[in-house]
Amino acid sequence: MGLPALEFSDCCLDSPHFRETLKSHEAELDKTNKFIKELIKDGKSLISALKNLSSAKRKFADSLNEFKFQCIGDAETDDEMCIARSLQEFAAVLRNLEDERSRMIENASEVLITPLEKFRKEQIGAAREAKKKYDKETEKYCGTLEKHLNLSSKKKESQLQEADSQVDLVRQHFYEVSLEYVFKVQEVQERKMFEFVEPLLAFLQGLFTFYHHGYELAKDFGDFKTQLTISIQNTRNRFEGTRSEVESLMKKMKENPLEHKTISPYTMEGYLYVQEKRHFGTSWVKHYCTYQRDSKQITMVPFDQKSGGKGGEDESVTLKSCTRRKTDSIEKRFCFDVEAVDRPGVITMQALSEEDRRLWMEAMDGREPVYNSNRDSQSEGTAQLDSIGFSIIRKCIHAVETRGINEQGLYRIVGVNSRVQKLLSVLMDPKAASETETDICAEWEIKTVTSALKTYLRMLPGPLMMYQFQRSFIKAAKLENQETRVSEIHSLVHRLPEKNRQMLQLLMNHLANVANNHKQNLMTVANLGVVFGPTLLRPQEETVAAIMDIKFQNIVIEILIENHEKIFNTVPDVPLTNAQLHLSRKKSSDSKPPSCSKRPLTLFHAVPSTEKQEQRNSIINSSLESVSSSANSILNSSSSLQPNLNSSDSNLDVVKPSRPSSLPPNPSPTSPLSPSWPMFSAPSSPMPTSSTSSDSSPIRSVAGFVWFSVAAVVLSLAWSSLHAVFSLLVNFVPCHPNLHLLFDRPEEAVREDSSTPFRKAKALYACQAEHDSELSFTAGTVFDNVHPSQEPGWLEGTLNGKTGLIPENYVEFL
């Protein structure tokens, strides 16, 4: 597990969790500094002690082999894994060189010692100086704050205002120092990935020059050296991009910290001074307090930054009432009283300022809670995935592929913003939608056209690959097994809405054509991933963790481009269950990790050879085939009985197999046989046995036979074969446009759902969400704003500020 990311928004809160996270980063820097010192010492010993060359080299190799890199985040890219393993590779090379009894080492001091000393003194030393400054400002701020809060409210207003201004200045300075220190720590942690390894690589290269007997070994080392150099350069390039993004975020936090505050599960949190009664008077103890409006739970953690830790046990109480203290009733300022259900007496608390007290009062006195809004930083504009949107993208793609497919830096070089906006305004004109592709784009530069395409995708109300699936795509990219990555992303793409998937397919086919011409345009698959990753998978909120995930967004786009034919033209296999994924990861981790040069996917690499298409093995037995033939014959006879079907029937949507509405209505919510496939993640409404529409009666008459036959087959199959049943049914859906009637709910239920207002509902059973669009809950949970969803058998409701899908027969309306 890597180091947790340090969020700039936590600098303002200065919470205990933030302090603990900061300590872990400081400990890692101290460990790195200590290791560099030891490495430098061993290197000097290697240069000076030729007689003990063998033992010195083995000690040096052992030191390299024992050190482990710690990267920010919960997963590593292929480049980072390659760099992290490089020290072990170096150790193995040194052991082999020891067998050859090499005796000559020259220029090792300049190549190895000087850069490491420079990194340790300039980078780690700067981080230590920043820590001293940060600790000093922490003590100064806390002392000033305590002194300020001890001022009597009876003093003159001018004196109080002057004191308030002074505290604000000290607080602002402390906040800026905190941000700069966090930024420096993040920078050093990222720099060590390349500034630390590069000198070692150069040192090894120097050794190969003077070792005649190591020539063959150096030749064998060439492939790994090349891959490692690419990985280091890629890491350096990502660092430059990430550093600018983090620096931009830090500046935004300085200008408006509240706007970029991270989403918190608590309605309100922060430091409060709690009055504690003693035998002789009272004392005020600093606590870090959190409050949840839904449960009315107040948690108080005694914590003082100056002492460096907790001062007692945590305490949680249930809020009964909250009342502001009158100014003349207590000497302290900014005070309010809290009554608890499970604790006698009144708890008097002191906020840090008048504004802070107002926020706490608003959160506790029954007013509407203040939540962080997930505002998209991109302008929504009027961009939509409609006919005009598809026309715009097709026109841009046509212009690029006919006039500029070989232009260097395609999609990387941006056009002039004013011309891009002008082109977009022309393309988004409804009149332009009917014109041919070349009529509009022929007069524009290719870089303007490519910038217009990217800008239009960024102007969509949400990213093309949707917020709700973003974490799933990132998790898929973090899987160690390449085949599992592709399989997971394949499954996720087919869970996207139809228009999103069509647009994504159109774009990926085009990007594959661009990558095929990379020798002319210099845009490899990896480079295209860097360009389109943040656009197609832009984060919902701007945080350091989101910036760190950009590298995995790029990997997702690479996989989509390289496997676009398989992903978009074939139906995904049954997704792995959580247990299978865990087993797959365990097997992958237990086996010896492959050499860096043999990994099939890196963040930046040349276009790989064409992958062989995987042949899918059929799992449908003879029973399923008989069901298919019987159902087809009945449907054909039924369609012949309906020559006068409404013309609108042909446009009705075909049911998607991701959520069949024919499953039993009330399975046991804790059934151990319930699979983790999203199709069976929750029950749906039962099948209708009759219909009020005479036009659909012949089709509906087939329902009993088809679903009875399917049910008989399903009961005899293992869960892993269930996907084949619905794949079979989908095969003859296009031939019978009215087949969707088999899956429809009764018209009465539809009318009832559509007329149902937003209401509250209570959960009858517990349910664990299988994907991001669903809600997890326990029995007895109460949902707000419950209303019908577009998914048959599912409702949409809100729980703890999150909106998602709820199984219809798991709840009852209140």
Swiss-Prot record:
A GO BP entry: mitophagy
Biased composition (Pro residues): 662-672
GO CC term, one of those recorded: cytosol
Arginine finger (site feature) positions: R412
Subcellular location: Cell junction, Focal adhesion; Cytoplasm, Cytoskeleton; Endosome membrane
CDD domains (UniProt xref): BAR-PH_GRAF_family, BAR_GRAF, RhoGAP_Graf, SH3_GRAF
Domain comment, as recorded: The BAR domain is important to associate RAB8A (or RAB8B) and RAB10 to endosomal membrane to promote tubule extension. The BAR domain is also important to recruit WDR44 to endosomal tubules.
Name of this protein: Rho GTPase-activating protein 26
Organism field: Mus musculus (Mouse)
